[in-house]
Amino acid sequence: MKIAVLVKQVPGSESSLPINESNDWIDESSITYVMNPPDNFALEEALIIKEKIGSGEVVVVSMGPSRVQKVIREGLAKGADRGIHIQEDENIETDPLTISERFTEALKSENFDLILTGLQSDDTGMGQTGVLIGEMLGFSTATLVIETDLKQDKIRVKRELAVSYTHLRAHETY
């Protein structure tokens, strides 16, 4: 099974966010960046799935300037098999659709069986990228997943809802 894990580099929770001199963005030079914590959970789940089935490939995918290579290396250190860096030097905090289109373009040729993302990023918190990518690639999509169970060509996920849990099943391409 070939699993992609999308990871975003976000400002650490202890970082200050000073405004730059032109007052139109933050001064990124003083920020400590980390892997988005929800994406870290997705990476952990991908590694668990690979271990359970006994084979496969986990690929960490991130988009942004050269500094995002740090979170790709972190993913590799945790057990991912390889990383893909989608180079983007511009301010990519535009909109989820544009970001999703860039990811989809990079993911298409890889033929992943499963794509995992965190619930949302700790910086902008939009939570739309994974769902949009799923739609663009024609994948079944589930959000708020807290547990997975793979059997042959099917995946069963447990989703955490406001007051209960629900289970969903998907076939072949997850």
Language-model features, listed with the residues they occupy:
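Glycine/small-residue-rich loop that forms an oxyanion/phosphate-binding "nest" at active or ligand-binding sites
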Residues: I92-L107
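Short Gly/Thr/Asp-enriched flexible loops that form oxyanion-binding sites at enzyme active sites
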Residues: T124-L137, T141
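N-terminal beta-strand-loop-alpha-helix module at the start
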Residues: M1-M63
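Short beta-strand-loop elements within alpha/beta enzyme cores
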Residues: E110-S121
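Anionic-ligand binding region
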Residues: T148, K154-Y165
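A glycine-rich helix N-cap at a beta->alpha junction
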Residues: V71-D95
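Single conserved hydrophobic/aromatic residue that forms the stacking wall/gate
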Residues: H167-A170, Y174
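Short glycine/serine/threonine-rich phosphate/pyrophosphate-binding segments
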Residues: E14, F41-L43, V68-K70, D123-T129
